[in-house]
Amino acid sequence: MRKLVVGSRRSKLALTQSQQFIDKLKAVEPNLEIEIKEIVTKGDRIVDKQLSKVGGKGLFVKEIQHELFEKNIDMAIHSLKDVPSVIPEGLTLGCIPDRELPFDAYISKTHTPLSQLPEGSIIGTSSLRRGAQILSKYPNLEIKWIRGNIDTRLEKLQTEDYDAIILAAAGLRRMGWSDDIVTSYLDRDTLLPAIGQGALGIECRSDDEELLTLLSKVHNDEVAKCVTAERTFLAEMDGSCQVPIAGYATISDQKEIEFTGLIMTPDGKERFEYTMNGTDPVELGKKVSNKLKEQGAYEIIKRLNEQH
């Protein structure tokens, strides 16, 4: 096997999860020589604005995909939730490895449970999806935007006027933070995850047969089916970063995929949700999308997209 070059964002989390995946590859192919090339993306350069206001999807992957096309790197290790639902022609997701915990972590400054926060308490989040779902269940709380890496957000929780923050559990776990700092992990009924949350997507060139064969050794087919249902739903709903959209699939003991899709307004006042079971992930994602469109969810999406 030739020497491989992996493209990664420069953030601590991106580099850590890249190294963790490389270790997984080396466990099945010990003699691999792999180098990490750090790439700064547009999303990394914009630190003072809400991402949904500056183009959302693709902000963390376009520069990396360019490096793949130029053959400066052989593969890219993405957080799957950052990857747009349509992959450019000539590239492919060559592998979906094991999924980390897909839920969100709620961290309170005073360890107060979410359901017991006093009226007017301020919750920091970087996501419309989280904000909308929290306001839907707890309209007496206030959402305030927070940006930055995990360390920055934890510091802001202590030094600024946030009473709590919500962030992806997967990032905390991959960075080695212990469960002790988490007040609670929010289950799917409290906060449905983002599309692909907790999963990695390993992107490479579609014609790189040698690499695709290697990647197949660490591919998790069940996780791939789940995220395919989720990402199909995202593509069908034409979900952009202006739209609070969530979707989560699991596989039952009967080997059926159960998928829940959710569309909301940012203020949490309008909510469209549907759950369905099936065996074909693409068909399932499309069916749930069609159900939500029948309920009127697509009108919300069009309205929100037009506003931006």
From Swiss-Prot:
Cofactor annotation comment: Binds 1 dipyrromethane group covalently.
Name by which UniProt lists this protein: Porphobilinogen deaminase
EC identifiers of the protein: 2.5.1.61
Quaternary assembly: Monomer.
Top enzyme class: transferase
Its job: Tetrapolymerization of the monopyrrole PBG into the hydroxymethylbilane pre-uroporphyrinogen in several discrete steps.
Positions of modified residues (S-(dipyrrolylmethanemethyl)cysteine): C241
Keywords: Porphyrin biosynthesis, Transferase
CC terms in the record's Gene Ontology section: cytoplasm
PANTHER family, per database record: PORPHOBILINOGEN DEAMINASE
Similarity comment text for this entry: Belongs to the HMBS family.
Species the sequence originates in: Staphylococcus aureus (strain MRSA252)
Catalytic reaction annotation: 4 porphobilinogen + H2O = hydroxymethylbilane + 4 NH4(+)
Claim: Transferase is one of the keywords in the record: yes
GO molecular function: hydroxymethylbilane synthase activity
Other comments on record: The porphobilinogen subunits are added to the dipyrromethane group.
GO biological process: protoporphyrinogen IX biosynthetic process
Cofactor: dipyrromethane
